[in-house]
């Protein structure tokens, strides 16, 4: 999910990425913590739970049923075709499951069709309305595509609660990059302000934390992403905590590796940071 004009296939679904163009308290006060990718080992054991992640990235009813006590599941959908046969076949098996938190409808949908197949707000609205009607209490979630640049983010003409009926919105403000020789923590403020100005209130925002670096990703400044240090990760959590002090859940990208990057599953220093954060919130 790092920002670039690259697509990824995961579990048969298409992931698009976040940009259209190529001590003090840490973090937010939330009880649910999500880390994408590689949540289960070959025996089906849930891995991120060991450091307090209690919202699982699930793609099957079997995974949802297997979750430990106290862990909920967020189910990947990734279609944006409205309430058609494929959508119903995907979501119906989860309805009524006590471990279900909700549905991850889309990752960086394109409202224009310029960069990826167009995702109509009305299709997201139909999907959200169906879920709210037939799975009462389940949440719908998307990660917004930045239609601008990291220096001047924009979500104008994109999705918000009014036009999509989606409950919760994330966005990828990943501040630690090679061309900066450090991290631009103010990037987080800029993204929050841009989302707010596009009609997404802070009460509907899901903090998305950078917890990866390296690999094949290229950012919109021509550099590459750098795995945050312990101090930098603490600042990311603190910055988000000041901007969005409560949230339905928060989101670390990512637990498992994609495109050869280093992620939480192999960074024990950052696991310690997130263990502290997750246990305190």
PLM regions with names:
Residues 1, 14, 23-27:
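Extracellular cell-wall/glycan-interacting regions and their flexible linkers
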Residues 1-8:
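N-terminal secretory signal peptides that target proteins for export/translocation
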Residues 10-20:
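Bacterial N-terminal signal peptides
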Residues 25-281:
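Glycan-processing catalytic domains of CAZymes
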